[in-house]
Regions:
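Conserved short histidine dyad/triad with adjacent acidic residue
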Residues: 24, 39-54
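Structural motif
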Residues: 67-69, 76, 92, 102
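Short beta-strand His + acidic residue motifs that chelate non-heme Fe in jelly-roll/DSBH
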Residues: 50-52, 70-71, 87, 93-99
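Glycine- and acidic-residue-biased ligand/ion/polar-headgroup-sensing regions
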Residues: 56-58, 62-68
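A short, N-terminal "cap"/entry segment at the start of jelly-roll beta-barrel domains
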Residues: 1-36, 116-134
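A short hydrophobic beta-strand segment most commonly corresponding to one strand
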Residues: 40-41, 86, 101-116
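Short acidic-glycine-tyrosine-enriched beta hairpin
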Residues: 74-89
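Short strand-connecting beta-turns/loops that link adjacent beta-strands
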Residues: 56, 100-101
Length: 134
């Protein structure tokens, strides 16, 4: 039975994409039995985490550094350090870094298996749907 897990983000290997990377510090792979997922997301300048949604989890985003824009429907909103964003399951969104420095934010999900679906599965930087954790 799992009692607790301590993870050092400095020791976590990033999952790399064309747009940046994610360091998953807690999920059911890191801590078997964990029912949530928690990661540190890095979006490179000029790059976009493409349009996607999560069928099985709520998402909380907390921006640590940099600035990015997030799109819901046809409207863009600015995220800056210190802002927190709540995204219900099933809401399509994409994040774009229009700045000159990387954007770093914490992403917390209410489920370890998020059920992520991309609008364009052939978009650059998208992992295949067979991937179990994204």
């Amino acid at each position: 039975m799992l009692r607790f897990t301590i993870t050092d983000v400095q020791e976590v290997e990033p999952v790399s994409y064309d747009w940046g990377a994610v360091k998953w510090v807690s999920n059911n792979e890191v801590a078997p039995g964990c029912e949530q997922s928690f990661g540190l997301v890095h979006i490179l300048p000029g790059k976009t985490n493409p349009l996607h949604w999560h069928t099985a989890a709520e998402e909380l985003v907390y921006v640590l550094s940099g600035e990015c824009d997030i799109k819901f429907d046809d409207t863009w909103y600015r995220l800056t350090p210190g802002r927190t964003l709540y995204i219900p399951p099933g809401i399509k969104h994409e994040l774009k870094n229009n700045g000159w420095e990387p954007v770093i934010y914490v992403a917390s999900f209410s489920a370890s298996m998020r059920g992520t679906i991309f609008d364009d599965p052939d978009a650059v930087g998208v992992r295949p749907l067979t991937a179990s954790l994204y």
